[in-house]
Regions:
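Catalytic cores of the polymerase beta-like nucleotidyltransferase superfamily
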Residues: 1-290
């Protein structure tokens, strides 16, 4: 429940960001007050703005378009896409802490991968994550059948799929809110999106083969500055950078020709509470690189 703005409920609703959030109920009569077509948009599973100038009043609403798409999987109305493109250069005006919150809400959503794809179509994604420009320059190769940008989004999708298929114990672990007010799963999907950011700067081609030597170490170091710029906490930064640094480690352990209980226990001791998370990220990475 939010405090009303304006001298009538209708004026208040017209100041909201999206039609699906601009619906009220008269508690005395039970009448639904919907002056922007929000009920119809919910039925049609469509995200649309109430008034495009509301994006100017608070540009964070540009990001909220994709946060709600990540949550519900709804399509975006063409006029909303056009408005986001029109005002995308305003996205840096809100406080960084507010942007951080919306990003993690987005990655909390089941359909985060869809939202990321659509953010890319309106330039918002590169405004928030400049490293995306570098991801797009690495083409499909023997390591992944997609270009690096789409491989990264596919990895986010595969993390969500693995979570959906996981046991109750694993889901309980990933649902824990250990840092930043958001679940481990949300942070793991953000790490999945960033897991290969070190590849562009380590990219070489030798005898036709693409190599990315130590991209995991380089990416982990790069992520620290990116996450600090987003005002993430030290715990959030430690977790995400650790996932990036060790996203190949579980695969090396599991594919070792001489895997032993000692090797497995060394992995568990090293990764500690993040053992399951790293395994899921490594598996998602492999599933995204067929």
């Amino acid at each position: 429940v939010t405090n009303p703005v304006g001298d009538s409920i209708e004026k208040d609703l017209m100041r909201r960001d999206l039609t699906i959030n601009a619906i009220a109920v008269n508690i005395r009569t039970g009448e639904i007050i919907d002056i922007s077509g929000g009920v119809t948009d919910i039925r049609n599973k469509c995200i649309n703005y109430v008034n495009e100038l509301n994006f100017v009043d608070d540009p964070l609403r540009l990001l909220r378009v994709y946060r709600f798409q990540a949550l519900y999987g709804f399509s975006l109305a063409p006029e909303t896409i056009n408005a986001v493109c029109k005002y995308s250069d305003l996205i840096h005006k809100p406080a960084v802490e507010r942007i951080n919150y919306e990003i993690l809400k987005l990655f909390s959503g089941e359909y985060a991968h869809i939202a990321l794809e659509n953010m890319n179509k309106t330039w918002i994604l590169e405004e928030i994550f400049p490293f995306v420009k570098e991801l797009k320059q690495v083409p499909p190769n023997s390591h992944h059948h997609l270009d690096l940008f789409h491989h990264s989004i596919e990895t986010v999708k595969q993390v969500q799929n693995l979570y959906s298929e996981a046991s109750d114990e694993v889901k309980e672990h990933l649902n824990r809110v250990d840092f930043g007010g958001f679940s481990r799963l949300a942070h793991l999907k953000l790490a999945a999106f960033m897991h290969d950011i070190g590849k562009f700067s380590t990219w070489t081609i030798e005898e036709g083969k693409h190599r990315f030597i130590k991209h995991d170490d380089v990416g982990a170091k790069m992520s620290v500055k990116i996450l600090k710029d987003l005002h993430c906490s030290n715990k959030q930064i430690d977790y995400i950078s650790s996932m990036i640094k060790y996203h190949i480690y579980p695969s090396h352990v599991m594919t070792s020709p001489q895997i032993t209980e000692k090797i497995m226990m060394r992995y568990v001791r090293k990764m500690d509470k993040n053992s399951i998370d790293a395994i899921i990220l490594a598996q998602a990475d492999r599933l995204s690189a067929r």
